[in-house]
Amino acid sequence: TFNLLESCRKFFYSLDVEKKSKFIFHHISTDEVFGSLGEKGRFSESTPYDPRSPYSASKASSDHLVRSWYHTFGLPVIVTNCSNNFGPWQFPEKLIPLVTLKGIQKEPIPLYGDGCNIRDWLFVEDHVDALLLAALKGKVGETYCIGGYGEKSNKEIVLKICEILDNEIPNQTPHNKLIKYVLDRPGHDKRYAINPSKIETELGWKPKYGLEKGLRKTVLWYLKNYDWCQNIFKKGNYRLERLGK
């Protein structure tokens, strides 16, 4: 992030006045920088930072760097913090493609801890629409939180994927019989949820897909594009496991 900011600062300073007026550094971040929620409430642009993992701490530091380049050097920036993305083409180690592909292959489906950790799921095309609006119509120096109104526990997501697979691959043992509870991930935050009212009110964004429609589209994509996943397995050492901590 530091290198990108410095390169963009130098480039920005080299532009004429007209081109400077059209320049923006759009920093795309995560809701994990805000920490973990209790049973109620949602993250917003005014939520204090409380990162609880090495990953979220690094993302939080990059957010602060971006804002410091804005305040110190006048670099025009916009920051967006999004909830959990999903959709076609996502690398198989993430929860939704991992569960889908495990189900297709009739392999055990891992579910961390008690499966009750909650995430706010955002379909990738809805996220892209929000990013374009923020970049083209957002106010310089502002932050916009992007969430999909898709709060579900990991267990609920896994069961829904199993239900879709049962409908698409009938006459087999129900896919939920493949679920296997495994040791929880270190530092596994309990709940994330975003209040996207600012970007809705100020920029007119609304999710078009939502969780149910987006999840079905995603599972069907992996069913139809299984060869794409097989190529990933052939070209590397990845074998459908969660990566990182």
Task: Map each language-model feature to its residues.
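A glycine/serine/threonine-rich, flexible loop-to-helix segment
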Residues: 41, 92-100
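Active-site proximal helix/loop that lines the substrate pocket
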Residues: 30-33, 84-90, 116, 136, ...
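Short glycine-/acidic-enriched loop or helix-start segments at secondary-structure transitions
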Residues: 36-38, 89, 155-157
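N-terminal Rossmann-like NAD(P)+-binding domain of SDR-like oxidoreductases, especially those catalyzing
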Residues: 1-85, 125, 131, 217-245
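C-terminal substrate-binding subdomain of Rossmann-fold SDR/epimerase-dehydratase oxidoreductases
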Residues: 97, 103-245
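Short coil/turn segments at alpha/beta junctions that flank glycine-rich nucleotide-binding fingerprints
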Residues: 72-76, 92-93, 138
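Hydrophobic alpha-helix immediately C-terminal to the catalytic Tyr-X-X-X-Lys motif of short-chain
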Residues: 61, 65, 69, 99, ...
